[in-house]
Structure formats: C-alpha cells, structure tokens
Swiss-Prot record:
Keywords: Cytoplasm, Lyase, Schiff base. Its main location: cytoplasm. CDD domains: DHDPS-like (cd00408). The gene is yjhH. Disruption phenotype: Disruption mutant has reduced ability to catabolize D-xylonic acid. YjhH-yagE double mutant cannot use D-xylonate as the sole source of carbon. This is Probable 2-dehydro-3-deoxy-D-pentonate aldolase YjhH. It is found in: Cytoplasm. It is an enzyme of class 4 (lyase). One of its GO terms (molecular function) is 2-dehydro-3-deoxy-D-pentonate aldolase activity. The active site is at T46 (charge relay system), Y109 (charge relay system), Y135 (proton donor), K164 (schiff-base intermediate with substrate). Its EC number is 4.1.2.28.
Length: 301
C-alpha cells in the first residue's frame, strides 16, 4: 500500500463567476504547484469547497483533476460526506477515474457513536482498494477523531494509511503520532495547520496538508526538504516566515476567498469567487493580506 508523505496542498477549486469550473485556471494552478516541488495534490478538501457542491460537481472536478495532473504527482480526492452512501459512491468514482488515494472527513452534522463512525469508515475503505486518509477537523465537524479512534480504524482496515490532523494542538499531534505509529509504523500523520509543520516533523510525523501551500509552497516545501536533509537551521528560518501566514485565516470567515486572493497576488489566474454561501473577501481584508505577503518576502516590495 502506497505511503504518502511531504507537502500536499489542499488545492483551491477554481470557478468562473457564473459558478462553472475554470479548467484553464485549474491546470495552471496544478502546473505551478508541481513545478514548486509539492509531493501530491489534494482536491475537494475544505478549501476546495466540496461542502458547497453536489455529487455531480464533485465527480466532474475529480475527473478533471486526474486528467490535468496526468500522473506527475499523486492525486488525492476528498470523498467525505454526512451520507455514507454518497461517500462510498464518491470513493468508487475516484478509484474508477484513476485517483491515487482518497481523503474522508468524518460525517458532520450528527455526532455519531463509535460504532456508527466505524461503520462509516469501514464502508468507505472496503468499497475500494485505494489508500484512504482520514481527515480530522473537529472545529468544523464537531467531533474529534481521537488517537484511540484512529488506531482502531487503522487496525480494522489495512487501506486506511494516514490522517490529516487539522487541530491546533501539539499534544494532539504528538499523541496521534506516538499512538498510531506504535502499531502501524507506516501510518502517515499530516498536520492541517501551517504553524505545526515543523512540530510535526520533529515529533516523527510525515508532512503537511495546509492551505498556504496554494500560494507559498516554497516555504513548506523548503521546510520539509531542509528537515529531510538534516538542515534544521534552514528549516527554522523558513518556519519563521510560515508562522506569519495563518494570520490570513483570521481576516474572513471562512477564509477561502482570501486563499484565492493570495494565489492571485503571486500571479495565478484565479477568480476570488467562491461558491455560495461564501462571499468574496472585503477590500480591507485583501489589503491586509497584501501587506502580510509583502512583509514575508512572498511578494516584492
């Protein structure tokens, strides 16, 4: 079973202002990220706006993603849903169209008991032969995938091979890494917050799936590569810059439009339009983003 590691951007979905998929921009974003040295691309995550799409839209984007990337790096497709049936259909569709793996957030709206959660993930994992990465984002789902839960799921399902742990806690990441890897050493643990990339590597984790890699992949890629080469000084220097970027996320709720604006700032031809109910970011917020990116050397003075 393939092991995933490194920097895997959760790619922002690109739309025209009428809400249709902007395939040209999608290709340019993929080319940009691959040329920057990322280790994979994750489509239809939180910043990919999967929650505002119907099943047909998600399938169409997944097909386009696989076509555009064309085997240059692994493609992960988000399949999570409040509906187990929909998640299974999306998983099987991703496999049929050539994805390299799937990512499944736990069902949201309901807070489900362990046996319900186990059944949800077992149905997804057993419906495909693809590797499955769990996605923990308790701030949005209302329910934490605890290290004990993840260990149980990993032991029950051989193709559950990793987790994106989007939680602002070094302790949670440490316990996740130590607990799951003690029984599945090959299990991949990715942080979901930019400011925990270096922490994750120091703790024995495997990389990051973080939003800033959409517009500043050179920082997270540089940190990861420096760490792998034993150059902690370079990793620490780059990390000081990366630590400033999460301030962007506090400027709008949700912050998805500001990620797209940041991508615009670095020259990518993307609209800042997002699918409703997410409105375009304010001009005031955009100005603050521009100042921040300039201060960190991502944009020229």
């Amino acid at each position: 079973m393939k092991k995933f590691s490194g920097i895997i951007p959760p790619v922002s979905s690109t739309f025209h202002r009428d809400g249709t998929l902007d395939k040209k921009a999608m290709r340019e974003v993929a080319d940009f990220l691959i040329n920057k040295g990322v280790d994979g691309l994750f489509y239809l995550g939180t910043g990919g706006e999967f929650s505002q799409m119907n099943t047909a839209q998600r399938m169409a984007l997944a097909e386009e993603a696989v076509t555009i990337v064309d085997g240059r790096v692994p493609v992960l497709i988000g399949v999570g849903s409040p509906s187990t049936d929909e998640a299974v259909k999306l998983a099987q569709h991703a496999q049929a169209y050539g994805a390299d793996g799937i990512v499944a957030i736990n069902p949201y709206y309901w807070k489900v008991a362990p046996r319900n959660l186990d059944d949800y993930y077992q149905q997804i994992a057993r419906s495909v032969t693809l590797p499955v990465i769990l996605y923990n984002f308790p701030d949005l789902t209302g329910q934490d995938l605890t290290p004990e839960t993840v260990t149980r799921l990993a032991l029950q399902n051989e193709n559950i091979v990793g987790i994106k742990d989007t939680i602002d806690s070094v302790g949670h990441l440490r316990t996740m890494i130590n607990t799951v890897k003690s029984v599945r050493p090959s299990f991949s643990v990715f942080c979901g917050y930019d400011d925990h990339l270096l922490n994750t590597m120091l703790l024995g984790g495997d990389g990051a799936i973080t939003a800033s890699a959409n517009f500043a992949p050179e920082l997270s890629v540089g940190i990861y590569r420096a760490w792998r080469e034993g150059d902690l000084a370079t990793a620490a220097t780059l990390n000081k810059k990366l630590l400033q970027l999460p301030a962007i996320y506090a400027l709008e709720t949700p912050f998805v439009s500001l990620i797209k604006y940041s991508m615009q700032c670095v020259g990518l031809p993307v609209e800042t339009y997002c699918l409703p109910p997410i409105l375009e970011a304010s001009e005031e917020a955009k100005d603050k983003v521009h100042v921040l990116l300039t201060a960190q050397g991502i944009l020229p003075v």
